[in-house]
């Protein structure tokens, strides 16, 4: 969801903290957090926004498992004239940049999307070597990766990472069902 489609979507770090605390008080065991640029309302990977959210939730004393996303930074949309060139709608960054906030803030868990799939106007792109790198770094920081899978092929990819020793047992799966294009 976006703030344009749903005015209840929290945008600022303080709104995200408040929403997470409300969810925990209502019975949520886990809060999965993305951050947005408060000025543009667009998704952000700004570590300082994540720090404000993480510290706000932890400082509240609420008993909830913190789950930070690693998803942003894997969205590729080709230009019409040359599909090898990313359009302005793309948001690609290095695997290191995608997990920087996780390594620094060390939530209990973080999402690790084991997927490459089409979305409405872009491809969500996760190269196997990037997944291996991110999973090793995440676990070395003491964070449990939540393996997000959207179809049976993604389960096979996750199992391969487990068999090859890139994901420690027991794995923690999140089955994302009812998602368009996945």
Please state what every model-predicted region is:
Residues 1-18, 70-94, 120-124, 180-182:
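Active-site mouth loops of central-metabolism enzymes
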Residues 13, 17, 28-40, 65-67:
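Histidine-centered catalytic micro-motifs
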Residues 16, 23, 34, 110, ...:
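Conserved, mostly hydrophobic/aromatic
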Residues 24-25, 58-61, 99-108, 136, ...:
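Acidic (Asp/Glu)-rich catalytic clusters
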């Amino acid at each position: 969801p976006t703030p344009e489609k749903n005015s209840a979507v929290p945008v600022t770090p303080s709104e995200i903290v408040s929403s997470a605390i409300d969810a925990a008080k209502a019975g949520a065991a886990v809060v999965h957090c993305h951050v947005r640029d408060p000025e543009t309302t667009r998704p952000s990977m700004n570590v300082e926004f994540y720090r404000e959210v993480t510290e706000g939730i932890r400082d509240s004393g609420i008993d909830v498992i913190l789950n930070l996303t690693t998803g942003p930074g894997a969205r590729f949309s080709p230009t019409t004239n040359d599909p090898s060139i990313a359009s302005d709608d793309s948001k690609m960054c290095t695997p290191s940049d995608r997990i920087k906030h996780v390594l620094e803030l060390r939530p209990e868990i973080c999402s690790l999307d084991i997927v490459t799939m089409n979305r409405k106007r872009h491809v969500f792109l996760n190269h196997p070597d990037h997944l291996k790198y991110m999973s090793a770094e995440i676990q070395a920081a003491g964070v449990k990766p939540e393996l997000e899978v959207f179809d049976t092929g993604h389960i096979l990819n996750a199992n391969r990472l487990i068999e090859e020793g890139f994901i420690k047992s027991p794995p923690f799966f999140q089955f994302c069902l009812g998602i368009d294009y996945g």
